[in-house]
Amino acid sequence: MLIGCPKEIKNHEYRVGLTPESARELARHGHEVWIESGAGLGIDATDEEYRTAGAKIVEGPDKIFAGCEMVVKVKEPQAGERSKLREGQILYTYLHLAPDREQTVDLVNAGVTAIAYETVTGPHGQLPLLKPMSQVAGRMSVQAGATALEKAHGGRGVLLGGVPGVMPGKVVVIGGGVVGFNAAQMAAGVGADVTILDRDPEVLERVGTHFETRAKTRFSNAANLHDAVCQADLVIGAVLIPGAAAPKLVTREMLGDMQKGA
């Protein structure tokens, strides 16, 4: 199969669909791999590394979209990329179609076979391609939240871990899945006062057993959610409905009742 990997063009996207190691593995199995020149620079992978791995470097994305049987990306194709897709082509990338009707219609009209990383499911119901990104998102959320809490960034001036004589910041994590678990792990690791909300008693039991005294758990209903959010310094939304848009659980009323700078 002729497999191509264009450079990502979405703002602030630095990842690449195929690493040199991935290209080498595909070539080893008899596939021909085309990489757009510069596609790997965001991860410090040079064109020469791809050539050494057995890939062909092509200038610009047009040849890849026109000639390759499968296009491997990271983020959903932008409008300019969708116009290049052709019938019978395989598109392999994160898509997140639920909130994006325009992209969905364009993909249907293009006649492509679109495989969304986030819905690829393992034999036990797990989401192996979404999980690592969820782990990153959960951990980064605490890092970003801690920065936002600084006075210089308009925050409450709260240090999540506190110091002797000063209470730690309160972190509320909505959802105890992969994102929520990793967010709670980071927050608890710096010494924050962590509360995890979820509707699944088994999830609450699992995270409660893991964190023991380092985090509290609460059943997620409207009253408990409102109470937790209003006391929080940092709220992290981490609810996943596979293949669907995330529900909007924090209402405008709750936002209005939050502490200034939270």
Regions of interest found by a model, annotated:
Residues 52-58, 73-75, 151-157, 215-221, ...:
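Short gly/ser/thr-rich secondary-structure transition/capping motifs
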Residues 6-45, 152-240:
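Glycine-rich phosphate/diphosphate-binding loop of Rossmann-like nucleotide-binding domains
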Residues 2, 8, 79-170:
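Glycine/serine-rich phosphate-binding loop and adjoining beta1-alpha1 elements at the start
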Residues 262:
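Glycine-centered, small-residue-biased loops immediately flanking beta-strands
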Residues 64-66, 85, 226-233, 255-258:
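A short, aliphatic-rich alpha-helical micro-motif
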Residues 60, 223-227, 250-254:
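Short acidic active-site motifs
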